[in-house]
Protein backbone atom coordinates (compact mmCIF):
# COMPACT_ATOMS: atom_id res chain seq x y z
CA UNK A 1 0.00 0.00 0.00
CA UNK A 2 2.77 2.40 0.94
CA UNK A 3 4.49 1.84 -2.44
CA UNK A 4 1.30 2.57 -4.40
CA UNK A 5 0.64 5.70 -2.35
CA UNK A 6 4.17 7.01 -3.01
CA UNK A 7 3.92 6.10 -6.72
CA UNK A 8 0.55 7.88 -6.97
CA UNK A 9 1.96 10.93 -5.18
CA UNK A 10 4.97 11.13 -7.51
CA UNK A 11 2.75 10.67 -10.58
CA UNK A 12 0.38 13.42 -9.44
CA UNK A 13 3.32 15.77 -8.86
CA UNK A 14 4.53 15.14 -12.40
CA UNK A 15 1.08 15.89 -13.79
CA UNK A 16 0.62 19.08 -11.77
CA UNK A 17 4.05 20.34 -12.82
CA UNK A 18 3.35 19.90 -16.54
CA UNK A 19 3.55 23.24 -18.31
CA UNK A 20 1.92 24.60 -21.39
CA UNK A 21 4.23 25.58 -24.20
CA UNK A 22 2.36 28.87 -24.57
CA UNK A 23 1.32 31.14 -21.72
CA UNK A 24 -2.36 31.31 -20.85
CA UNK A 25 -4.22 34.65 -21.04
CA UNK A 26 -4.57 34.53 -17.25
CA UNK A 27 -0.81 34.16 -16.80
CA UNK A 28 -0.08 37.04 -19.20
CA UNK A 29 -2.57 39.23 -17.30
CA UNK A 30 -0.88 38.23 -14.04
CA UNK A 31 2.46 39.43 -15.45
CA UNK A 32 1.02 42.72 -16.75
CA UNK A 33 -1.31 43.91 -13.97
CA UNK A 34 -0.58 47.62 -14.48
CA UNK A 35 -2.09 47.59 -17.98
CA UNK A 36 -5.59 49.07 -17.76
CA UNK A 37 -6.45 49.18 -21.46
CA UNK A 38 -7.83 46.74 -23.98
CA UNK A 39 -6.23 43.29 -24.35
CA UNK A 40 -5.95 40.72 -27.11
CA UNK A 41 -7.71 37.37 -26.66
CA UNK A 42 -4.36 35.86 -25.63
CA UNK A 43 -4.11 38.36 -22.74
CA UNK A 44 -1.46 40.64 -24.20
CA UNK A 45 -1.94 44.39 -23.74
CA UNK A 46 -3.34 45.94 -26.91
CA UNK A 47 -1.15 49.00 -27.29
CA UNK A 48 -2.77 51.20 -29.92
CA UNK A 49 -1.30 51.53 -33.40
CA UNK A 50 -1.23 55.32 -32.89
CA UNK A 51 1.12 54.95 -29.91
CA UNK A 52 3.33 52.54 -31.84
CA UNK A 53 3.60 55.08 -34.66
CA UNK A 54 4.49 57.88 -32.21
CA UNK A 55 7.21 55.71 -30.66
CA UNK A 56 8.97 55.45 -34.03
CA UNK A 57 9.95 59.11 -33.70
CA UNK A 58 11.80 58.95 -30.38
CA UNK A 59 15.44 58.09 -29.88
CA UNK A 60 16.78 55.14 -27.88
CA UNK A 61 18.14 57.65 -25.35
CA UNK A 62 14.69 59.20 -24.87
CA UNK A 63 13.05 55.80 -24.41
CA UNK A 64 15.79 54.70 -22.02
CA UNK A 65 15.40 57.92 -19.99
CA UNK A 66 11.66 57.36 -19.54
CA UNK A 67 12.18 53.72 -18.54
CA UNK A 68 14.87 54.61 -15.98
CA UNK A 69 12.68 57.34 -14.48
CA UNK A 70 9.91 54.76 -14.05
CA UNK A 71 12.26 52.40 -12.18
CA UNK A 72 13.14 50.08 -15.06
CA UNK A 73 16.90 49.93 -14.59
CA UNK A 74 17.67 46.69 -16.42
CA UNK A 75 15.95 47.18 -19.76
CA UNK A 76 18.95 48.05 -21.91
CA UNK A 77 21.40 45.84 -23.78
CA UNK A 78 24.01 47.20 -26.17
CA UNK A 79 25.95 45.80 -29.13
CA UNK A 80 22.98 44.66 -31.20
CA UNK A 81 23.49 44.04 -34.88
CA UNK A 82 20.59 45.73 -36.64
CA UNK A 83 19.64 44.42 -40.07
CA UNK A 84 18.36 47.82 -41.26
CA UNK A 85 19.94 50.33 -38.85
CA UNK A 86 18.26 53.40 -40.35
CA UNK A 87 14.74 52.06 -39.78
CA UNK A 88 12.84 52.27 -36.49
CA UNK A 89 10.89 49.24 -35.32
CA UNK A 90 8.08 49.35 -32.80
CA UNK A 91 5.40 46.82 -31.98
CA UNK A 92 3.66 44.61 -29.48
CA UNK A 93 5.81 41.65 -28.55
CA UNK A 94 5.32 37.93 -28.81
CA UNK A 95 8.05 36.32 -26.73
CA UNK A 96 9.72 32.93 -26.88
CA UNK A 97 12.52 31.33 -24.94
CA UNK A 98 14.60 28.49 -26.28
CA UNK A 99 17.03 26.21 -24.52
CA UNK A 100 19.77 24.19 -26.18
CA UNK A 101 18.14 21.23 -27.91
CA UNK A 102 17.99 17.94 -26.04
CA UNK A 103 16.23 15.01 -27.74
CA UNK A 104 14.43 13.92 -24.56
CA UNK A 105 13.16 17.41 -23.81
CA UNK A 106 12.22 18.12 -27.43
CA UNK A 107 10.02 15.02 -27.43
CA UNK A 108 8.08 16.33 -24.42
CA UNK A 109 7.79 19.86 -25.82
CA UNK A 110 6.46 18.54 -29.15
CA UNK A 111 3.97 16.28 -27.33
CA UNK A 112 2.68 19.27 -25.34
CA UNK A 113 2.61 21.34 -28.53
CA UNK A 114 0.44 18.70 -30.16
CA UNK A 115 -2.02 18.95 -27.24
CA UNK A 116 -2.06 22.74 -27.82
CA UNK A 117 -2.72 22.22 -31.57
CA UNK A 118 0.67 23.57 -32.63
CA UNK A 119 2.22 22.60 -35.97
CA UNK A 120 4.04 19.29 -35.86
CA UNK A 121 6.01 19.82 -39.08
CA UNK A 122 9.42 21.47 -38.77
CA UNK A 123 10.89 22.93 -35.61
CA UNK A 124 9.30 24.61 -32.63
CA UNK A 125 10.79 27.94 -33.76
CA UNK A 126 7.78 28.32 -36.08
CA UNK A 127 5.26 28.18 -33.21
CA UNK A 128 5.59 31.85 -32.18
CA UNK A 129 5.38 32.84 -35.85
CA UNK A 130 2.04 31.04 -36.14
CA UNK A 131 0.44 33.38 -33.58
CA UNK A 132 1.82 36.70 -34.87
CA UNK A 133 -0.68 39.40 -35.82
CA UNK A 134 -0.16 42.75 -37.58
CA UNK A 135 1.99 45.03 -35.43
CA UNK A 136 3.74 42.23 -33.49
CA UNK A 137 7.49 41.93 -33.01
CA UNK A 138 8.83 38.42 -32.42
CA UNK A 139 11.23 38.59 -29.43
CA UNK A 140 13.19 35.43 -28.65
CA UNK A 141 15.85 34.42 -26.17
CA UNK A 142 18.07 31.79 -27.77
CA UNK A 143 20.71 32.11 -25.03
CA UNK A 144 23.06 33.78 -27.50
CA UNK A 145 23.60 30.45 -29.22
CA UNK A 146 25.29 30.80 -32.58
CA UNK A 147 26.43 27.40 -33.86
CA UNK A 148 23.52 25.00 -34.49
CA UNK A 149 21.10 27.47 -32.98
CA UNK A 150 19.79 29.83 -35.63
CA UNK A 151 16.17 30.79 -35.06
CA UNK A 152 15.28 31.96 -38.56
CA UNK A 153 16.56 32.46 -42.08
CA UNK A 154 14.96 34.40 -44.89
CA UNK A 155 12.11 31.88 -45.41
CA UNK A 156 10.81 32.26 -41.85
CA UNK A 157 11.69 35.97 -42.03
CA UNK A 158 9.25 36.30 -44.94
CA UNK A 159 6.60 34.47 -42.92
CA UNK A 160 7.18 36.75 -39.92
CA UNK A 161 6.86 39.86 -42.05
CA UNK A 162 3.76 38.57 -43.85
CA UNK A 163 2.00 38.07 -40.51
CA UNK A 164 3.30 41.06 -38.52
CA UNK A 165 4.63 43.69 -40.95
CA UNK A 166 7.47 44.09 -38.42
CA UNK A 167 10.48 41.95 -37.53
CA UNK A 168 12.44 40.29 -34.75
CA UNK A 169 14.59 40.91 -31.71
CA UNK A 170 16.72 37.83 -31.03
CA UNK A 171 19.31 37.06 -28.39
CA UNK A 172 20.67 34.32 -30.57
CA UNK A 173 21.50 33.97 -34.21
CA UNK A 174 19.92 34.06 -37.62
CA UNK A 175 21.17 32.80 -40.92
CA UNK A 176 21.06 34.45 -44.31
CA UNK A 177 21.18 38.03 -43.05
CA UNK A 178 21.63 39.19 -46.63
CA UNK A 179 18.32 37.58 -47.57
CA UNK A 180 16.63 39.01 -44.47
CA UNK A 181 17.88 42.51 -45.35
CA UNK A 182 16.12 42.24 -48.72
CA UNK A 183 12.66 41.74 -47.17
CA UNK A 184 11.13 45.20 -47.65
CA UNK A 185 9.89 46.55 -44.29
CA UNK A 186 11.42 43.74 -42.20
CA UNK A 187 13.94 44.57 -39.50
CA UNK A 188 15.87 42.61 -36.94
CA UNK A 189 17.93 43.35 -33.86
CA UNK A 190 20.25 40.41 -33.36
CA UNK A 191 22.72 39.78 -30.54
CA UNK A 192 24.78 36.77 -31.51
CA UNK A 193 24.53 36.94 -35.31
Predicted regions and their residues:
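Bacterial Sec-dependent N-terminal signal peptides
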Residues: 1-19
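Short acidic, Pro/Gly- and aromatic-enriched capping/linker segments at domain boundaries
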Residues: 19-39, 50-52
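Short, surface-exposed secondary-structure edge patches
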Residues: 37, 128-129, 177
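Phosphate- and other anionic-substrate recognition elements at nucleic-acid/protein interfaces
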Residues: 43
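N-terminal low-complexity or amphipathic/hydrophobic leaders
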Residues: 46-119, 123
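Extracellular/luminal Protease-associated
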Residues: 121, 125-171
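Short, well-ordered, mixed-charge alpha-helical segments that flank or form enzyme active sites
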Residues: 146-149, 176-180
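Phosphate/pyrophosphate-binding betaalpha-module
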Residues: 169-174, 180-193
Amino acid sequence: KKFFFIAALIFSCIITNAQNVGSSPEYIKLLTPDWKGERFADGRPKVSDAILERLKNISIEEAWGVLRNKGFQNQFESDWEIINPGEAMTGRVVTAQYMPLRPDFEKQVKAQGKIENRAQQGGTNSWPIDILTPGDVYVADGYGKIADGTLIGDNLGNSIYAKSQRGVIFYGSVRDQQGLSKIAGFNGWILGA
